[in-house]
Design a protein with these regions (language model features):
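Aromatic- and acidic-residue-enriched carbohydrate-binding clefts of CAZyme catalytic domains
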Residues: 1-17
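Alpha-helical scaffold elements lining the catalytic groove of polysaccharide deacetylases
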Residues: 18-30
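Active-site-proximal helices and loops of the catalytic beta/alpha 8
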Residues: 30-32, 36-143, 147, 164-166, ...
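Ligand-binding/active-site lining segments
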Residues: 150
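Surface-exposed cleft-lining segments at the edges of enzyme active sites
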Residues: 157-161
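Short helix/strand-capping turn motifs
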Residues: 182-183
Length: 183
């Protein structure tokens, strides 16, 4: 655990010492600068759970106070909704701590839809029933409408990586675009 939070997530990715007040202040001010200079709408924070929890929580609090309509998406690569919900702002699961992170990434949806694409929904817990069963845990999220859903990203294989099945992609995209999530 300390290797993840106090050093190196992987050997090619050294951490910045966010416990150092000068480093922390630089990161906050740098975020403000990019928001103002480039007029960006949001930040996707990679490997969110592996940074210093208190520093990240305070960073999010400062960003939310300075820019209330601004959003940060935290990559929380866990495939169970209870673990993902723990990281969302105002989660009762993490109380009394608060990450202040408005949007978490729904790796459960990604995982289930990518398994379901090769299965028929003819028995319980197979096919699209897997996706449904991940949605039943929405009550764990303080704000399920602010969860980011996706069928692939830059860290994963392409959804159609195993062949061209346009109807399957259309069905997955329809589900992605109509579910109670940020697509």
């Amino acid at each position: 655990f300390s290797q993840m939070n106090d050093g190196w997530f992987v050997t090619a990715m050294p951490d910045l010492n966010q416990k150092n007040p000068h480093v922390y202040r630089y990161l906050v001010q740098n975020s403000f600068w990019w928001i103002e200079y480039a007029d960006i709408d949001g930040i996707r924070m990679d490997t969110y759970p592996y940074a210093d929890y208190d520093a990240m929580s305070n960073w999010m609090k400062e960003l939310n106070e300075e820019y209330p309509n601004y959003n940060t998406v935290g990559e929380t690569w866990v495939t169970e909704p209870a673990y993902t919900a723990w990281w969302q702002k105002d989660s009762k699961l993490s109380a009394p701590k608060n990450s202040n992170l408005k949007t978490v990434m729904d790796f459960s949806f990604y995982d289930k839809i990518n398994i379901a694409k090769t299965e028929e929904t003819e028995t319980w817990f197979k096919g699209l029933d897997r996706v449904y069963n991940s949605f039943v845990y929405d009550f764990l999220y303080p704000n399920p409408e602010s969860v980011l859903a996706f069928i692939e990203n830059h860290d994963t294989d392409r959804f159609l990586g195993e062949g061209d099945n346009l109807p399957m992609l259309k069905q997955a995209s329809t589900l992605l675009l109509t579910t109670r999530r940020i697509p």
